[in-house]
């Protein structure tokens, strides 16, 4: 009969085998990249996905809930962040400068990407799985496809303030399925920190703020027995603590699957 130590050894070896076979993380994620970590360049691995010149996901969306990320103002300069970058959705909308110096096709010049999707592949403490367009943007002019053919490379990154093109307004998308007793909001195009960590609404003529809960990605929601009629003022808080109010941005008679811009 096998000894208990022999059985334990077999179990351990089997666990190691399963870890190798099924991709149990071998490289733990790094510390979260916050809005206040500073401007030091850090090392990361980078890959790309989707069409070579596309915005990543087939539907031009992603785990943050944004749509049409191939169009302005994201314009396909998008990517997935791993755990310390995506942060269970709280990293959605944050901006990073990235650059590479190897292979030779790299320009060495930084470009800005927006976090719009999630990536949990455990290949490095920090990992950006970029759109094909964003990956190619790190190349010397004319060498975009040559760089994409590398597949995976080392890059340097740092978090930066988001600076959307002039005229871009913070936008609140009332998600599909919203009704007077259920409201889900996606907040996007936030300058500065870029990401949102809290959302509250206030009905016109009332003093009380109603806190929304995180749903998924960049979407916040509330279920209430009392009907929400609007107009609503929306207050959103970024990771750095900045609070901004968009007065009466959601009008009376609001509709689901509709976007409303701040004034």
UniProtKB/Swiss-Prot annotation:
The gene is PHLPI. Homodimer. SMART domains: DPBB_1. Disulfide bonds join 64-92, 95-162, 100-106. This is Pollen allergen Phl p 1. SUPFAM superfamilies: Barwin-like endoglucanases, PHL pollen allergen. Coiled coil: none annotated. It comes from Phleum pratense. One of its GO terms (cellular component) is extracellular region. The keyword Cell membrane does not apply. Residues 61-167 form the Expansin-like EG45 domain. Belongs to the expansin family. Expansin B subfamily.
